[in-house]
């Protein structure tokens, strides 16, 4: 029996093929963590390298082409996170890798911009597939009732920011400690608090090693 993730991969492949732009949409987390500017991968697993959906590939090679006359250009593509997964419990994960300090203004702005944009264009695709009777939320999640897209994102979608190990600082440690103790997060991570309050079920940050131990090691497709 196919996992919800595998069925979602097939759904997006169907969308890409019907749009006339068949592409390879899956890559490993290691591959998707590549920092192009410095030619370094932010994440390497000691346990297992999960296959995941490349949101950048779909945004740049399919969505951009549909709206810009067949052009596959990064500068006209909608913003997107690096990776997307669905686990055995039916939760959806939007994952962004950054080889920068969490205190960086660019990191914070990118996370907010990419989250909003990616949710919008992905759910626009899902709306098109739903109109063709090829998609329903209950087939790709643990949702058992009819639900609006906005409610679905808030109840079943989670955001994860992964910071490179050599960019871990006191600010990241304070955020992690506050999260574990279920205390109010520092003002410096207000962008995560906003994402969790307004968009996602949760918004978390890990170092690459923490992500490996606490998420990847425990992750199950089915």
Q: For each predicted feature, which ranges?
A:
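Acidic-basic catalytic patches of nuclease active cores, encompassing PD-(D/E)XK
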Residues: 1-74
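Generic surface-pattern signal
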Residues: 17, 127, 177, 197-200, ...
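Beta-rich catalytic cores
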Residues: 79
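A hydrophobic membrane-anchoring alpha-helix module
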Residues: 11-14, 218-222
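Phosphate-ester processing/binding pockets and catalytic centers
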Residues: 74-76, 88, 101
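Conserved catalytic cores of phosphodiester-cleaving nucleases, focusing on short active-site segments
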Residues: 83-85, 91-99, 118
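Short, low-complexity, polybasic intrinsically disordered segments
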Residues: 146-216
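Catalytic cores of nucleic-acid endonucleases
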Residues: 100-178
């Amino acid at each position: 029996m196919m996992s919800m993730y595998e069925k979602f991969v097939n759904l997006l492949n169907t969308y890409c093929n019907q749009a006339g732009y068949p592409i390879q949409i899956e890559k490993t987390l290691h591959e998707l963590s590549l920092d192009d500017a410095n030619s370094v991968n932010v994440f390497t697993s000691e346990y297992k390298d999960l296959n995941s959906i490349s949101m950048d590939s779909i945004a740049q090679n399919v969505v951009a082409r549909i709206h810009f006359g067949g052009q596959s250009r990064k500068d006209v593509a909608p913003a997107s996170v690096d990776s997307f997964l669905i686990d055995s419990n039916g939760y959806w994960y939007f994952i962004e890798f950054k080889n920068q300090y969490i205190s960086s203004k660019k990191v914070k702005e990118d996370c907010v911009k990419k989250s909003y944009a990616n949710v919008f264009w992905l759910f626009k695709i899902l709306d098109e597939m739903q109109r063709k009777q090829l998609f329903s939320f209950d087939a790709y999640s643990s949702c058992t009732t009819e639900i609006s897209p906005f409610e679905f994102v808030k109840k079943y979608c989670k955001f994860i920011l992964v910071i490179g190990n050599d960019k871990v600082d006191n600010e990241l440690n304070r955020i992690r400690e506050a999260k574990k103790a279920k205390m109010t997060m520092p003002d410096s991570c207000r962008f995560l608090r906003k994402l969790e309050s307004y968009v996602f079920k949760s918004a978390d940050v890990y170092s690459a090693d923490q992500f490996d131990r606490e998420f990847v090691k425990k992750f199950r497709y089915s």
